[in-house]
Amino acid sequence: METEKKVSLPRILRISVTDPYATDSSSDEEEEVDFDALSTKRRRVKKYVKEVVLDSVVSDKEKPMKKKRKKRVVTVPVVVTTATRKFRGVRQRPWGKWAAEIRDPSRRVRVWLGTFDTAEEAAIVYDNAAIQLRGPNAELNFPPPPVTENVEEASTEVKGVSDFIIGGGECLRSPVSVLESPFSGESTAVKEEFVGVSTAEIVVKKEPSFNGSDFSAPLFSDDDVFGFSTSMSESFGGDLFGDNLFADMSFGSGFGFGSGSGFSSWHVEDHFQDIGDLFGSDPVLTV
């Protein structure tokens, strides 16, 4: 259904004025009339009415509504502050960044180190600057771990020694050495050469052993080497060592050379019976 528009009629405003001294005419003759005579007569009151036509006024409902401008609401990002660790020389900005600064003890001023995304990054930069300004004894956010013995290095060295013993003397390099071993190539070649050789192919070949009796005869005579045609005894005119050499010498019983314990009673063969074992040959391995 279409809504019928109400037609507003013009408004009329009537103004009425009552004038008790109003007259019908304004002639000069009437001005000469005696007022005393008129006072006794009935006075005539004249009323004036004036109409004013007012234009129609548009109703408030028909007036066009002005569009209201929406005010822009500036939203400030809310930074959620959690229970984080507080670092030395690090503070958080209102917009969420982390700033780092340090005080220079020599110049007595604050040195700006920069702005970072996380507090840990700012703390690390502060630690580096503190070490440069105050030395290794500076208070740090992340102190270095205490120096401990390197147990892994010791265990590696022990393992290398055990491998050397088990491997039959193979030349192994130290795990901490930076120098090349001159025997590494040779040991590798020898190891590759003996790979695949079975123990069944190794035959022990024994050579005849030499006894002490083989050395009983002299290899060379004195005459052949030095060319002596005569013996030493003939050169000096007789026996050099005769039977009576020790005849004039008398030994007491304290030396054990008496009648019962002379040179004849010594068992010389007992002292040299094992001489053949010294010259025995080791078995030779043949492949």
From Swiss-Prot:
DNA-binding region(s), chain positions: 86-143
UniProt main location, coarse: cytoplasm
Task performed by this protein: Component of the cytokinin signaling pathway involved in cotyledons, leaves, and embryos development. Probably acts as a transcriptional activator. Binds to the GCC-box pathogenesis-related promoter element. May be involved in the regulation of gene expression by stress factors and by components of stress signal transduction pathways.
Family matches, as Pfam families: AP2
Gene Ontology CC: one annotated term: cytoplasm
Gene Ontology biological process terms in this record: cotyledon development; cytokinin-activated signaling pathway; ethylene-activated signaling pathway; leaf development
Compartments where found: Cytoplasm; Nucleus
One GO molecular-function entry: transcription cis-regulatory region binding
Protein name per UniProt: Ethylene-responsive transcription factor CRF1
Parts of the chain that traverse the membrane: none
Keyword Zinc: no
Keywords: Activator, Cytokinin signaling pathway, Cytoplasm, DNA-binding, Ethylene signaling pathway, Nucleus, Transcription, Transcription regulation
Key word Cytoplasm present: yes
Family according to the record: Belongs to the AP2/ERF transcription factor family. ERF subfamily.
InterPro entries (alphabetical): AP2/ERF_dom (IPR001471), AP2/ERF_dom_sf (IPR036955), AP2/ERF_ERF_subfamily (IPR050913), DNA-bd_dom_sf (IPR016177)
